[in-house]
């Protein structure tokens, strides 16, 4: 039985939402033996998890993660009746990459359970909040962090180009905050205030804010 606590932009520049550095590598995933019609086979636990309709969003959100996630989801989305479990542990990353993942999740007709395992920060929090209502779960000691997008390092040039970058960043901020408002039930003014700083929330606070629905200790 699941243990739960109920709580109540599109730009041309590569924008990031900040966050700590994590690499997207699963080279150390162990293998297990499985009995098949052709005999005993050794398979990666990631392959085994995908067979069980489990997908992982771990690490920095970038183009490589989008590619991996899209390939897995397109395979699973062919079955619109069976649940998909998505586990997220991400410090954030590139906005455009994150919005691609967000859009893919929104387009999925299959029921999706979303689990925050450790951290959903920055763009990761936007993706997590965009999970299906009533199916967004967070572990008791996991954290969520929301904030404004960050200007990419090295941005410079003429006054006009800097102004153009600033305008694009404001559009991105508005787009991300509108997504958060849509999925949390907060009005846009509340979200604007909440994202003015690195706003860290524990599991219960994330439920209260509307980013997720349940605190759980059951990942199945």
Say what each PLM segment does.
Residues 2-220:
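Terminal-region recognition feature
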């Amino acid at each position: 039985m699941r243990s739960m606590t109920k709580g109540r932009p599109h730009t041309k520049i590569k924008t990031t939402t900040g966050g700590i550095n994590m690499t997207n590598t699963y080279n150390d995933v162990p293998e297990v033996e499985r009995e098949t019609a052709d005999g005993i086979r050794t398979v990666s636990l990631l392959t085994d998890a995908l067979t069980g309709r489990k997908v992982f969003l771990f690490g920095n959100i970038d183009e490589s993660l989008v590619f991996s996630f899209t390939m897995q989801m397109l395979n699973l989305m062919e079955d619109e009746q069976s649940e998909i479990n998505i586990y997220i542990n991400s410090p954030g990353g590139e906005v455009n990459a994150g919005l691609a993942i967000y859009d893919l999740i929104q387009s999925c007709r299959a029921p999706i359970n979303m689990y925050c395992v450790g951290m959903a920060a920055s763009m990761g929090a936007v993706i997590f909040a965009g999970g299906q209502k009533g199916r967004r779960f967070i572990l008791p000691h996991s954290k969520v962090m929301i904030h404004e997008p960050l200007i990419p390092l090295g941005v410079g040039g003429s006054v006009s180009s800097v102004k153009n970058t600033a305008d694009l960043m404001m559009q991105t901020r508005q787009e991300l905050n509108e997504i958060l408002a849509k999925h949390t039930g907060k009005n846009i003014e509340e979200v604007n205030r909440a994202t003015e700083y690195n706003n860290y929330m524990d599991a219960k606070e994330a439920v209260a804010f509307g980013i997720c629905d349940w605190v759980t200790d059951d990942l199945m």
